């Protein structure tokens, strides 16, 4: 069987299809908004569907902003949006065995915040860099959610330009940290993307969870890298460099 949601740009008929190996439709779901990445069919026959909100706070290809849960019969059971001045969901999600959902989000940082941690340039007229974070959200009721765990790339930076800053170090000796000066921070005129100027830095795409190891893996398109982080940590441990099963935060 195959589950898919066609990406259509000009339509009010957004659907998810479950088909068999002969292409016959087993079930379908109708949605008011277009898909952000890919849907997930759960063991209990519910569907988790990431969708593109009407007005994303950080706009670029693959942007989403909303999550919905449907019954097998298409009844909307839950819907929640992550599209505000701090966070913007984009690309993939990962439903967890406990019913929670891992969500990739942009985390907006100003040029001043970037310079304060050693960033040397901002390549876009927004004067922003869109960092990345992983949020574990727990659905609450019909339209709410709680963040029960989180990991922020901003807590794991290194730079070798300004020795007066606490994150100064030899980059090659710290593969667990991210060089704040690696890669461009978005695009501006005349090379803007269809959504306009942006602060996209790493551009995370896919996320997956390994239940046996309690680890999260995700990929960066812009930097051609795959990362693995420890999910056994507390949120406080995840912001540092110790604790958890790996002992590295």
Report each predicted region and the residues it spans:
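Histidine-/acidic-rich catalytic cores in large beta-rich domains
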Residues: 1-249
């Amino acid at each position: 069987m195959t589950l898919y949601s066609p990406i259509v740009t000009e339509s009010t008929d957004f659907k998810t299809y479950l088909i068999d190996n002969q292409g016959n439709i087993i079930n379908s779901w109708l949605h008011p908004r277009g898909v952000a990445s890919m849907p997930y069919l759960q063991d209990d026959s519910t569907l988790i569907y990431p969708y593109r909100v009407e007005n994303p706070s950080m706009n670029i290809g693959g942007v989403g902003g909303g999550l919905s849960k449907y019954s097998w019969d298409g009844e909307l059971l839950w819907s929640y949006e992550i599209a505000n001045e701090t966070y913007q969901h984009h690309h993939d999600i990962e439903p967890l065995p406990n019913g929670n959902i891992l969500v990739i989000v942009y985390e907006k940082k100003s040029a001043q915040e970037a310079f304060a941690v050693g960033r040397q340039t901002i390549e876009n007229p927004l004067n922003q860099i869109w960092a990345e974070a992983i949020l574990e959200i727990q659905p609450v009721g019909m339209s709410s959610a709680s963040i029960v765990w989180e990991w922020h790339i901003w807590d794991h930076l290194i730079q070798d330009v300004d020795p007066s800053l606490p994150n100064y170090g030899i980059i090659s000796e710290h593969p667990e940290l991210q060089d704040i000066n690696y890669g461009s921070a978005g695009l501006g005129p005349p090379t803007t993307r269809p959504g306009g100027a942006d602060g996209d830095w790493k551009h995370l795409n896919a996320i997956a969870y390994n239940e046996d190891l309690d680890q999260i893996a995700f990929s960066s398109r812009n930097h051609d890298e795959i990362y693995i982080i420890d999910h056994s940590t507390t949120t406080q441990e995840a912001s540092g460099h110790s604790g958890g099963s790996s002992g590295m935060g």
